[in-house]
A protein has these predicted regions:
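Nucleotide and nucleotide-moiety/phosphate-recognizing core
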Residues: 2-123, 138, 147-160, 168
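Short, basic/aromatic-enriched C-terminal tail that caps enzymatic domains
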Residues: 162-176
Length: 176
């Protein structure tokens, strides 16, 4: 099912990590969560939730902010929990989607569901677009949750779907 109305979506921004490998909190870098929230607003998404990790991080972000439930031990548990809490389609977005722009997000929202490929042809499950009727997988890894979603190839936009886990990746990307 393709959704042409972005208002039908809930956007869920992942901002709960410690970012120790980056040396700073990724949720605050390059405009951070606020930039991603604004992209969602610009695309017409009305329900935007930031998953902040611990309760202590709630005050760091604007809008609707949810701490991770204490029964969730890893990110796959949190994703499974969120899927149970939110009816309708969900667009997931990691806080380190530094290159995501409005046109790329709009393309994801209009994709009908799936997991986009980045510029290295890797599936980026933290940018999954989950249709309302999608049943999250049973595995314990984030990848396994979205195994049954199609791979989305958006011509000319794959750079927008990269994420960054180490400073060296960020340096390489922004020097080219």
């Amino acid at each position: 099912m393709t959704y042409n109305n972005s208002q039908q979506f809930s956007a869920v921004i992942f901002a709960g990590g410690n970012s120790t490998r980056m040396g700073q909190d990724k949720s605050l870098m390059f405009g951070g969560v606020e930039r991603i929230r604004q992209l969602c607003i610009d695309c017409g998404v009305v329900k935007i939730i930031t998953l902040c990790g611990s309760e202590e991080r709630v005050s760091m972000f604007e809008g609707e902010v949810w701490p991770d439930p204490t029964h969730c031990q890893k990110l796959s548990d949190v994703i499974r929990w969120v899927r149970g809490e939110l009816p309708g389609p969900i667009q997931f977005i990691p806080c380190d989607a530094f290159d995501l722009d409005r046109d790329s997000l709009q393309s994801l929202l209009q994709s009908g569901g799936g997991v986009p490929l980045d510029s290295n042809s890797n599936r980026q499950p933290l940018l999954a677009n989950c249709p309302a009727d999608y049943q999250i997988g049973d595995g314990s890894s984030v990848n396994s949750l979205f195994d049954d979603l199609a791979t989305i190839v958006i011509a000319g936009r794959s750079d927008s779907f990269s994420n960054y886990n180490e400073k060296s990746q960020l340096n390489e990307r922004h020097q080219s």
